[in-house]
Amino acid sequence: MMPVMTIRYYAPSLQMASVMQVVLPERDNLPLRSAHVLLGPEGSDSSWWLRHARLEVLASTSGVVFLMPAVLEGCGFDMAFGYRFGQSLCQDLFVELEHDLPSLALRPETTWVVGLGLSGLGALHAALTRPDRFCGAACLGAVPDIAAYRNGKASSSYLTPARLKCLWGQREDGAPSVPDTVDLLTKRAREGASLRFYLGGCADEPETKAFCAACSSGIPCHVQNLGLETPIQEPEIYLEDFLNFSVPPMD
């Protein structure tokens, strides 16, 4: 089987054609030990991770399969005014893999969703929304400052204020209505969901601290500060550290 594949498919949730990249371990005798759905930063296509990390090397040394859908403007969320990227991530991607690569046999207990920037928030939200699909999520970098986006004091080079309103809707004061991931986490903890989380930022940052506090009710959360200004500049370093956290050492 080729280590890198491009799968083009129709995504019913988006009602349009979509594409994902798949990176498999190159060693035929190496069992697949876990699957990692990788989301690039906001606005990125399915090739972003291929261009920014040595995924073939990491897949072959860790026994991991990497799955990379296009992020575009959705960041792993269903848009308030636009496409249902969240549903496509949690549903269409898995249906297509069952059809095209049934030998992967993805299992929820070994499937992670990983994101950068606002897609890191999308990854956390995806795992909390569908704990039947994922065993956990990683936000490679600090949890985005939701309050700053909510009051209009933060945006990104791709997600302008207008695009943010399309993504998350708009409150009466005109600011984007941002999903409250901490509330969703608290709900899942009460339900006894079996999830794990990795946050690649400083534990003292407000949103990271709030997320960890909510995790203290029973859901494991690991915070790793690698001292980098932004993980988007060195994504492979964060990804390698996350693999050390999420994938048990091979015998």
Predicted regions and their residues:
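Non-catalytic cap/lid and distal C-terminal segments of serine-dependent acyl enzymes
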Residues: 1-251
